[in-house]
UniProtKB/Swiss-Prot annotation:
It is found in: Secreted. It comes from Arthroderma gypseum (strain ATCC MYA-4604 / CBS 118893). Belongs to the peptidase S8 family. Its EC number is 3.4.21.-. Residues 20-116 form a propeptide. Residues 424-450 have a biased composition (Pro residues). Secreted subtilisin-like serine protease with keratinolytic activity that contributes to pathogenicity. Glycans are attached at residue 251. The gene is SUB1. It holds the Pfam family Peptidase_S8. This is Subtilisin-like protease 1.
Amino acid sequence: MGVFRFISISLAAVSAANAAQILSMPHAQTVPNSYIVMMKDDTSDDDFNHHQSWLQSTHTHNITRRATVQNAGMRHKYNFHKMKGYSGVFDDETIKDIAKDPKVMFVEPDTIISVHGKVDQNNVPSWGLARISSSKPGTQDYTYDSSAGEGITVYSVDTGVDINHEDFEGRAIWGSNQVNDGDDNDRSGHGTHTSGTMVGKEFGIAKKAKLVAVKVLGNDGSGPTSGIVAGINWCVEHARQNGGTNKAVMNMSLGGGSSSALNRAAAQAVEQGMFLSVAAGNDNTDARSSSPASEPSVCTVGASAEDDSRSSFSNWGPSLDLFAPGSNIISARPGGGSQSMSGTSMAAPHVAGLAAYLMALEGISGGAVCDRLKQLGSASISDVGPGTPTNVLINNGGAKGDGKSPKPSPKPSHPSEPQQPTEPQQPAPGEPSTPAPAPMPPTPQHPHTPFPGGDDFDFDGFWKKYFGGEHWRKMFSSFFN
C-alpha cells in the first residue's frame, strides 16, 4: 500500500510538472468559462480521438459531481494541417484535467474579437481604387489588367456577405456560418462592404475573382475567438477541395487581444499556401498587442488617408507590412447600393483584392504575395508611427493596363448610419453544425472592363447569443533597426 501510494504521488507530481500552460489574457475581454485547447503538433488522429472521448467522460463526471447546470462541453473542433484542437465551455476542474494531458500544447481563454471598421460620414469621394493604380494621390481612374483576379477564390471571414448584391454579379456564394445564429445574412454591413472592395464589379479590385462568405462575427460585429479559428479551419479545407490553397486569399478585417490560438490558426493557413490579409487595428497603438495582426506570417495592413498620411486611428509598429486606403471608403451595402466606412477593416480588403489580382496575373501564391506587394508599392505614407518598418502604400504596378474601371459613385447611394445591434438568439446546445463545403459556381464571362468602442459592447446579449444564459521577428524587429 505504501509503495502504491508513493508511485501515485510521484505520477501526480510528474503530471503537474508537465502540465500544459493555461494562458492568461489580462488585456482582453474574455468569455466566462469558455476556452480554446490546442494539441501538440505530433498528436495523431487516434490520439486526438482518444482525448475527445476522455474529455466527454471527464466533463460529464465533473459537472455531475459539482451538481452544476453548466454543461455545454465541446463546441468547435479544429483539425487542419498540423493543427488539432477544440473549444468549449468547461468548469475549472475539467480545464485543470485537460492541461495535464501530455498531448495538450496550451489552454487559452476564449476572447472577444471585433471588426476593425465603422460606418462613417457620407458625401465623400471614392478614391481608394484610383490611388492603388497611380503614382500619386488625386487621380480619378483605376487602371488594371483585364485578368482581374480570374481563377482566384477570396474568402471573406467577417460578418457575412449579401451574396445577392448586384456588384458581385453572381460570383459570390455562402460558405459557412460559425456564429450559429441561423441567419445566413450580413445584418451588420461590414462583410458586404469589405467584400465589395475585394471583388465588386464597381467597387472592387479583383473584379473576376470568386467570393466565399464565412460568417464568424454576429450582427453587432463581434464574436468569440473560438468561432474565428473554426472559420479559418473551414476555409482551408474548402480551398483544398476547390481549386487549391495556392489559389486562395483570406481577408480578416477583425481582431482582438493577443491570442496564441488565433495566431497559430492563421499561421497554419499560410503554411498551407493561402494568402492572409489582416487589419492592423484601429486603436492608434502598437499592433503587436492584437491578433491575428501580430502573427508574422500574415500580411498586416495599416490604413492610409487620401493625402497619403497614416489614418489617425490606424495601429502601427513592427507588425505592419503595408498600408492601403482606409479612410472614407465607399463600397457595397447589404440590400443594394453603397455606403462609406473607415478603418483598417477597409484597408485590408484592398490588399486582399490586389493579392488576388496579382495571383491571377503573375501566378504567385502564399507568402510570396506579401513580398511582391511590397516591391510594387510606393514609399508614400507619412507619419507611419513608432517602430513601423514600412511606409509602403500598395500599388498594382501599372499591370498591363488594358482595362479601366468605371468611376465609382461620387457618394454613397444610401445614408450611412451606425448599425444597431440586434438581440441575439439562443444557439442550440452542443457543437454547431458546419455545412459541407459548397461547390464553387462557374466563372461568369464578363467583358474586359474598427475596433468598436468597448463601452458600446452588449455583453449580456453576446453571452445569450453564444453560450445560452515566425512570432519573434516582428515582435523584436524594432530592436534591430
